[in-house]
Each structure stands twice: as structure tokens, then as C-alpha cells.
Amino acid sequence: MNRILDHIGIGRENAVTREELEMRMGLPDRTIRNMIEAARREGALIVNDGSGAGYYISDNLEDLKRQQKMNNSRAMSILVQQKHLRRRIKELEAKENA
């Protein structure tokens, strides 16, 4: 996977914030976020409970359900924005082609 997993603990009690990860790894926030996303895409069960406690690896049913719910909410928000973007793009393209 990627080396971010060497710095993210297992279980909520071992959660680490992005700021801590930045300090430990000497990397900027955006790089840390990209590494977390890449590890998740590769199958790492990195969760963030939204409380500010940070990131941790979990195999706990409730943790995973909470993360899934947060992910679904984000995905729906993006899809709604995409709908508005598509509509506006069509309007502008029609105006341009008129």
C-alpha cells in the first residue's frame, strides 16, 4: 500500500490527526490527504469519526457503518453539484452554438 499506514494506528484510541501526520512525515496537508485517499482506494479501512480525533484503521462494525454513511453523504453532495454543473454547461454550450 503506501507508507501512510505506518503512521495510522489501529482503533479509535490510536487515532492520529492530519496535523500529527504532517509533523511525523514532514509532508504538507494536501499530500497527506492524497495518501489517505490512495490507501483507501487500495482497500485500507481508514476511518475518521468526524469528532476531530483523527484517522485510524478499524474493523469495528459501527466505525465502518459511520464511515460509509459519511462517504455516502459526500458522494450525494458531489452528485447534486454535478447536476447543476451539467445544466449550466448545456445552457452555455447552447448559447455558444446559437
Where do the language-model regions lie?
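A short, conserved structural fragment
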Residues: 40-50
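A short acidic, leucine-rich amphipathic alpha-helix
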Residues: 17-24
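Long, low-complexity, charge-rich intrinsically disordered regions
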Residues: 67-98
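Short, leucine-enriched amphipathic alpha-helices that occur as contiguous helical runs
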Residues: 1-5
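Short, charged/polar, Gly/Pro-enriched secondary-structure boundary elements
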Residues: 61-67
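Minor-groove-contacting beta-hairpin "wing" of winged helix-turn-helix DNA-binding domains
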Residues: 51-59
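Short amphipathic alpha-helical interaction segments
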Residues: 27-38
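Short helix-capping/hinge SLiMs at alpha-helix to coil transitions
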Residues: 8-14, 42
